A protein has these predicted regions:
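Basic nucleic-acid-binding interfaces
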Residues: 1-29, 34-79
Length: 79
């Protein structure tokens, strides 16, 4: 079961996903940056809007889900 998801600033979200094994992939259009996570031979590329001041809890969860993190992995990252 997931802990309560916090709202995060862009730099906090980047630190969180990088600690989970994600890497910077390339610059996207506008304020977006693309990050990649390699799992089981799959490559998941997710755009993150760096122009936002603070990301809402549902947005943070959606980003983590797009990378393929499980509930247990998300709880471990949020410790």
């Amino acid at each position: 079961m997931l802990k309560k998801m916090p709202s995060l600033k862009a730099r906090q979200l980047i630190r969180l996903i990088e600690s989970g094994g994600c890497e910077f992939y390339r610059e996207g259009k506008g304020d977006h940056k693309l990050y990649v996570r390699h799992t089981d031979g799959n490559k998941r590329v997710v755009p993150i809007d760096m122009g936002e001041r603070e990301f809402s809890p549902p947005y943070v969860l959606r980003i983590l889900r797009q990378f393929g993190f499980t509930d247990d992995e998300i709880n471990e990252l949020l410790r």
